[in-house]
Amino acid sequence: MPRYKLVIEYDGSPFCGWQRQADDPTVQGAIEAAVTRFSGENARLTCAGRTDAGVHAIHQVAHLDLAKDWRTDTVRDALNAHLRPQPVAILSAETVPDSFDARHSAIRRHYRYRILNRRSPAALTRAHVWHVPWPLDADLMHDAAQRLVGRHDFSAFRAAECQANSPIRTLEQLDVARAPMALHDEIVVATAARSFLHHQVRAMVGTLMLAGCRRLAADDVAEILASGDKSRCGPLAPAAGLTFVGVDYDPGK
């Protein structure tokens, strides 16, 4: 039974997240329905990162097993045909060994968060940014962000309904910078870790926003982290600004 690795792009706006639900539209549900229409099989997808409602992806990775040995370009093109007009695209399909698991083989996941930092709201990108109309200092945000990098208990930045067994995570990257001049109204937060807690990225971004408008100092952010107290962190940044941008796998496996 061949295993296929899919690279997927989607606009999360119309979906109630990645994970299949009985009555609500989801990315997984849309792709699995396309698989059934194309192949006649009820295959199940496993993805690298299960995104929440409204969260986007430009390089999500998933795998599925099919009984028939299809050409990979046929898999890609047939799924794209059956997914239309939904905002989901299969960028590539390839066969992989049975040992490959899109979720468990991942060694690093990358997310990007976009903040539109200007007085006027977004006209074209409103479903892909968090509009913050007051001035933010990206350098202050970046300085505060470095207090969160490393292996820590991230209970303060964890959703109440998070089902992870442990709040301990190793944050490998959390960089904040204003975009180049052509997009200078945007502040971009880039982060990477092997895994994240539910709502961790959005909670961190909301807290860094307070550092950017000088309501919190970098030391305050470190204290919030150490306290484990969710009530002390900033607002939960909206889902719209968050995009899953990639996943790394051990090249030797």
Curated annotation (Swiss-Prot):
Q: Does the keyword tRNA processing apply?
A: yes
User: Member of which family?
Assistant: Belongs to the tRNA pseudouridine synthase TruA family.
The GO terms describing molecular function are: RNA binding; tRNA pseudouridine(38-40) synthase activity
* EC number, UniProt record: 5.4.99.12
- Outline the subunit composition: Homodimer.
Presence of the UniProt keyword Transcription regulation in the record = no
Q: What is the lineage of its organism?
A: Bacteria, Pseudomonadati, Pseudomonadota, Alphaproteobacteria, Hyphomicrobiales
Q: What is this protein called?
A: tRNA pseudouridine synthase A
Q: Which InterPro entries match?
A: PsdUridine_synth_cat_dom_sf (IPR020103), PsdUridine_synth_TruA (IPR001406), PsdUridine_synth_TruA_a/b_dom (IPR020097), PsdUridine_synth_TruA_C (IPR020095), TruA/RsuA/RluB/E/F_N (IPR020094)
Q: Which residues bind substrate?
A: 111
The protein's UniProt keywords, in alphabetical order, are: Isomerase, tRNA processing
Any GO BP? tRNA pseudouridine synthesis
What is the reaction catalyzed?
A: uridine(38/39/40) in tRNA = pseudouridine(38/39/40) in tRNA
CDD domains, A to Z:
PseudoU_synth_EcTruA
Functional note: Formation of pseudouridine at positions 38, 39 and 40 in the anticodon stem and loop of transfer RNAs.
Show the active-site residues: 52 (nucleophile)
